[in-house]
A protein has these predicted regions:
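Conserved PLP-binding catalytic core of the aspartate aminotransferase-like
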Residues: 2, 15-43, 62-65
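Hard-cation-handling environments
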Residues: 11, 35, 45, 66, ...
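Conserved N-terminal alpha-helix of the aminotransferase class I/II PLP-enzyme fold
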Residues: 118, 163-188
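Short beta-strand
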Residues: 18-23, 50-54, 140
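Noncatalytic alpha-helical scaffolds and linker/capping helices
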Residues: 42-45, 53-80
Length: 188
């Protein structure tokens, strides 16, 4: 994710676009001045949801579903300049400033990370922790939460569907009509 965001940042910078956040993981903020609204509308029309930030600025979030083709298309939509993503990828790999942010101290030093040397040993340890946990499927809460206890697991399956759970965080209201209808019905 970060690599694609870094490629996007480099491509935009080379095309003359100001990237305002120096440090980032997956989200860029760009300053387009008076062009921000027209670029926002063009990206919306192309199927990309950007965030309208401060006056003249847009936010771009890169996630697991973003591809190299998306990066090229976004740079072209925003700047009008076509880029070679592979060339930028090589440049970003060689000049990654995030290397300075990598952890250098000792990690996983707690004894639990060093005392289980087999898969079955680790599974036994995890099962022991699980058995200590108090959960609704192993106990009963005497007061309240009746609805929660009675909901069948199958009723919860839709929550895992992409159509339900993959709403883009910057999606405009016209793309969230189903969510708005569902929320309205829950308030009645």
């Amino acid at each position: 994710i970060h690599r694609l965001a870094a490629i996007l940042a480099e491509g935009l910078k080379r095309a003359g676009v100001t990237v305002t956040n120096r440090s980032f993981f997956d989200t860029l903020r760009i300053d387009l001045g008076a062009r921000a609204l027209s670029v926002y509308q063009a990206t919306q029309a192309a199927g990309y949801n950007l965030r309208q930030a401060a006056s003249g600025e847009l936010g771009i979030a890169v996630d697991e579903k973003t591809t190299a083709d998306d990066i090229g298309a976004l740079v072209k939509l925003i700047s009008g300049v076509a880029i070679d993503v592979a060339t930028l990828d090589a440049h970003v790999a060689a000049n990654d400033p995030a290397a300075a942010l990598l952890r250098t101290d000792a990690i996983l030093t707690h004894p639990v990370f060093n005392c289980h040397h087999t898969e079955h040993g680790m599974l036994r340890y995890l099962k022991k922790l699980q058995n200590r946990d108090l959960a609704l499927d192993h106990s009963m809460i005497s007061l309240g939460s009746c609805t929660m206890k009675l909901n069948a697991t199958s009723e919860m399956i839709p929550v895992t569907w992409a159509e339900f759970g993959d709403m883009h965080p910057f999606a405009p209201l016209d793309q969230a009509q189903g969510y708005l209808e569902m929320i309205e019905s829950l308030t009645e």
